[in-house]
């Protein structure tokens, strides 16, 4: 019952019935999700939609048993109590309730950065060199993996978002501290080649890639603070020009579809500062909808305001 992207359009808020805005949860991204969900809820109500907040998966399960809602707008971020790992999608499928975003497979695959990379590489799509580290990897294995990839590298949890638990490593002395930080959030870790250059992201809405955004943080990189707290990060949209812009939009669509995603989402990309080559990083299947978030910024470039964006995402459940 996930959103199958088609041409269903409506101007009648009653067509949606009662809508649950799924937010909060218990993942490490709870606060971001509460912020996103509050914005979505306000936008739907402003358009006359009968929308109610539902905090987390257990509350949603109770509501579905009681048949309280006709569809779900999912802005539950992350995994382990979040809404991007396929678990809540399976719940909604079991109850036959339409919902926004990717289905079970697309959500679960995209949450696992390592599996996503394997799919992309099998299709010839570029992604940085990487290694997987199991929980409790020895210091010898950690340093060996770093040498194989070549410094500098990124160390991150394999199944987290919002730059939670992510470190940049420029010398071997920083490695074990970075691994310890990432391991707080997930058992499996991803060690990845650090691409020096432009950080870009491309939002996908239905079958359309929106204009890319080039992210220019005031600090060295786009961390949690730059994403959600600081007001000095620059967002350039479109992030590229001409053929380069067309290329990154097509790459994002290819990567999104390869991961089995649909509905809406966001694809993060690095552009090598020397060669100009594009490298896929990850897919976000329930992107942020905060004041700092990137999907609304890209939509505005096409004249789509926030309320209209939220409406169009929900329309895909009809």
From Swiss-Prot:
Q: Name one GO biological process term.
A: cell wall organization
- One Pfam family here: Dala_Dala_lig_C
Q: Which cofactor does it need?
A: Mg(2+); Mn(2+)
Keywords, alphabetical: ATP-binding, Cell shape, Cell wall biogenesis/degradation, Cytoplasm, Ligase, Magnesium, Manganese, Metal-binding, Nucleotide-binding, Peptidoglycan synthesis
| Cellular component annotations (GO), alphabetically ordered | cytosol
The catalytic activity of this protein is classed by the Enzyme Commission as 6.3.2.4
Q: Binding residues for Mg(2+) 1, per the UniProt record? A: 268, 282
Where, in this chain's numbering, is ATP bound?
Answer: 146-201
Where is this chain's protein located in or outside the cell? Cytoplasm
The note describing how and how many cofactors are bound reads: Binds 2 magnesium or manganese ions per subunit.
HAMAP family associated with the record: Dala_Dala_lig (MF_00047)
Family, per entry: Belongs to the D-alanine--D-alanine ligase family.
What's the name of the protein?
D-alanine--D-alanine ligase
Q: Give the species this sequence originates from.
A: Xanthomonas axonopodis pv. citri (strain 306)
């Amino acid at each position: 019952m996930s959103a199958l992207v088609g041409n269903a359009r409506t101007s009648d808020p009653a067509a949606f019935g009662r809508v649950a805005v799924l937010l909060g949860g218990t993942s490490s991204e709870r606060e971001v999700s509460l912020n996103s969900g509050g914005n979505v809820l306000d936008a739907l109500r402003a358009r006359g939609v009968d929308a109610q907040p539902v905090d987390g998966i257990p509350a949603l399960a109770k509501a579905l048993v009681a048949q309280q809602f006709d569809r779900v707008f999912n802005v539950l971020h992350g995994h382990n109590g979040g809404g991007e790992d396929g678990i809540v999608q399976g719940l909604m499928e079991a109850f036959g309730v339409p919902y926004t975003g990717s289905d079970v497979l697309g959500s679960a695959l995209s949450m696992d950065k390592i599996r996503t990379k394997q799919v992309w590489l099998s299709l010839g799509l570029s992604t940085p060199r990487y290694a997987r580290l199991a929980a409790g990897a020895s210091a010898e294995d950690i340093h060996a993996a770093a040498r194989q990839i070549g410094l500098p590298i990124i160390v991150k949890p394999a199944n987290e978002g919002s730059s939670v638990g992510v470190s940049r490593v420029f010398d071997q002395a920083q490695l074990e501290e970075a691994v310890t930080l990432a391991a707080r959030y997930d058992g499996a870790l991803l060690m990845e080649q650090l691409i020096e250059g432009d950080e870009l992201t491309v939002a996908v809405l239905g079958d359309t890639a929106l204009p890319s955004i080039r992210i220019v943080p005031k600090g060295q990189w786009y961390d949690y603070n730059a994403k959600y707290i600081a007001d000095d990060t620059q967002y350039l949209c479109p992030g590229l020009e001409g053929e380069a812009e067309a290329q990154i939009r097509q790459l994002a669509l290819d990567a999104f579809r390869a991961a089995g995603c649909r509905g809406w989402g966001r694809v993060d990309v690095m552009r090598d500062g020397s060669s100009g080559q594009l490298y896929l990083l990850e897919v976000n299947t329930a992107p942020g909808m905060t004041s700092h978030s990137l999907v609304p910024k890209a939509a505005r470039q096409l004249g789509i305001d926030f309320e209209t964006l939220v409406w169009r995402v929900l329309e895909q459940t009809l």
